[in-house]
Swiss-Prot record:
This is 5-hydroxytryptamine receptor 3D. Residues 363-410 are annotated as: Disordered. SUPFAM superfamilies: Neurotransmitter-gated ion-channel transmembrane pore, Nicotinic receptor ligand binding domain-like. It comes from Homo sapiens. Belongs to the ligand-gated ion channel (TC 1.A.9) family. 5-hydroxytryptamine receptor (TC 1.A.9.2) subfamily. HTR3D sub-subfamily. The HA-stretch region of HTR3D seems to confer increased conductance to HTR3A/HTR3D heteropentamers compared to that of HTR3A homopentamers. Forms homopentameric as well as heteropentameric serotonin-activated cation-selective channel complexes with HTR3A. The homomeric complex is not functional. Heteropentameric complexes display properties which resemble that of neuronal serotonin-activated channels in vivo. Pfam families: Neur_chan_LBD, Neur_chan_memb. One of its GO terms (molecular function) is serotonin-gated monoatomic cation channel activity. Expressed in liver, as well as fetal and adult colon and kidney. InterPro entries: LGIC_TM_5-HT3 (IPR049944), Neur_chan_lig-bd (IPR006202), Neur_chan_lig-bd_sf (IPR036734), Neur_channel (IPR006201), Neuro-gated_channel_TM_sf (IPR036719), Neuro_actylchol_rec (IPR038050), Neurotrans-gated_channel_TM (IPR006029). Forms serotonin (5-hydroxytryptamine/5-HT3)-activated cation-selective channel complexes, which when activated cause fast, depolarizing responses in neurons. The gene is HTR3D.
Length: 454
């Protein structure tokens, strides 16, 4: 059985991989790392660092993974159900593992742990209990083998009665079993919209071992992976991008109206329903253990990081909703019980709004409207009253009343000024998150264009 997987399963180093696509670079293992009894792991460190990407130097070249099974069973004439044992191997070509045996002491094979190399996203259900413990690297050919004979996940029954010609009955039973296997697996093949079953062919041969003759049934299963990115773009990227754009447009709603938070809750609920509906369309390998955590739109090459991209979109929506709730609460507290803005926060706000660097608010002009009076500005002192101009009792009462009115007016002005500062700070936070949204959308579009062209 042969599997074609175009490109890497993940793009952990997206920027590096896009820059080095198609350059034809190869990695040659240094021979000083090869000893008489062992190989220094540092010699393969450059290969281990690239385990997140496909073992190719040009992503337009497909990686061919050949899967072979060895089935064996001990037939029991008194048993109706026979359980088969299997041993499978998956060799593929790794362009990063290369060395010259003549210069490396004649060493042609080296074993290494599976966690250090790229693994093909092909899983044999119920074939082995766990992932093989090691790989065998043999001159750019990597083989993933299971060292133990494990039980296969399917069983076949063949029942015949002893007769004059038991070999004919046995051959007839083989034909019945192969026919049922072929029909059953053709109808129950689960594509998950990722794999296409090309066909199942079988042939029966006779094998002679010593003086005994055995019949062997060989099945050739051909599958192909869907390489077209159009279904993923239409089903996943376009609806998700539309919902993200709608959530970004909600930043234009005024925070004081109180309609921003309910609108974002509705969009978040709609995106959650979209993820639940698309759960059945996601490939079975979208949550692979060796999937990348970067490159959210790498499903143009392979659908592995689709779940990561959706998680990033959902995180942005949740963060936007929490930020809206926090700003609404901040505005409510600022209008009911205004507190003075901290000095460091005031300096940061002046730094942002003074030059128009990161906040869309306009700088204050002049000293119009309520504000601090000139007598409370730094460096300005109140005029002194001379001894000859002391006010009388009636004038003192009028002066005291005017001072109380002025103090009350100054207190209201300071309160209003504090409210304005908190409002400016809230709008600055809202503008910062809006720019983060725009940055994420721009990077997503650029990544889609780059991956589509490559």
């Amino acid at each position: 059985m042969q599997k074609h997987s175009p490109g890497p399963p993940a793009l952990a180093l997206l920027s590096q991989s896009l820059l080095t696509t198609g350059n034809g670079d190869t990695l040659i293992i240094n021979c000083p790392g090869f000893g008489q009894h062992r190989v220094d792991p540092a010699a393969f460190q450059a290969v281990f660092d690239r385990k997140a990407i496909g073992p190719v130097t040009n992503y337009s070249v497909a990686t061919h993974v050949n899967i072979s099974f060895t089935l064996s069973a001990i037939w029991n004439c008194y048993s109706r159900i026979h359980t088969f044992n299997c041993h499978h191997a998956r060799p593929w070509h790794n362009q990063f593992v290369q060395w010259n045996p003549d210069e490396c002491g004649g060493i042609k094979k080296s074993g290494m742990a599976t966690e250090n190399l790229w693994l093909s996203d092909v899983f044999i259900e119920e074939s082995v209990d766990q992932t093989p413990a090691g790989l065998m690297a043999s001159m750019s050919i990597v083989k993933a083998t299971s060292n133990t004979i494990s039980q296969c996940g399917w069983s076949a029954s063949a029942n015949w009665t002893p007769s004059i010609s038991p070999s004919m009955d046995r051959a007839r039973a083989w034909r019945r079993m192969s026919r049922s296997f072929q029909i059953h697996h053709r109808t129950s093949f689960r594509t998950r919209r990722e794999w296409v079953l090309l066909g199942i062919q079988k042939r029966t041969i006779k094998v002679t071992v010593a003086t005994n003759q055995y019949e062997q049934a060989i099945f050739h299963v051909a599958i192909r992976r869907r390489c077209r990115p159009s279904p993923y773009v239409v089903n996943f990227l376009v609806p998700s991008g539309i919902l993200i754009a709608i959530d970004a447009l909600s930043f234009y709603l005024p925070l004081e109206s109180g309609n921003c938070a309910p609108f974002k809750m509705t969009v978040l609920l709609g995106y959650s329903v979209f993820l639940l509906m698309m759960n059945d369309l996601l490939p079975a390998t979208s949550t692979s253990s060796h999937a990348s955590l970067v490159a959210p739109l790498a499903l143009m090459q392979t659908p592995l990081p689709a779940g990561v991209y959706f998680a990033l979109c959902l995180s942005l929506m949740v963060g936007s909703l929490l930020e809206t709730i926090f700003i609404t609460h901040l505005l409510h507290v600022a209008t009911t019980q205004p507190l003075p803005l901290p000095r460091w926060l005031h300096s940061l706000l002046l730094h942002c709004t003074g030059q128009g660097r990161c906040c869309p608010t306009a700088p204050q002009k002049g000293n119009k409207g309520p504000g601090l009076t000139p007598t409370h500005l730094p460096g300005v002192k109140e005029p002194e009253v001379s001894a000859g101009q002391m006010p009388g009792p009636g004038e003192a009462e009028l002066t005291g009343g005017s001072e109380w009115t002025r103090a009350q007016r100054e207190h209201e002005a300071q309160k209003q000024h504090s409210v304005e500062l908190w409002v400016q700070f809230s709008h600055a936070m809202d503008a910062l998150l809006f720019r983060l949204y725009l940055l994420f959308m721009a990077s997503s579009i650029i990544t889609v264009i780059c991956l589509w062209n490559t």
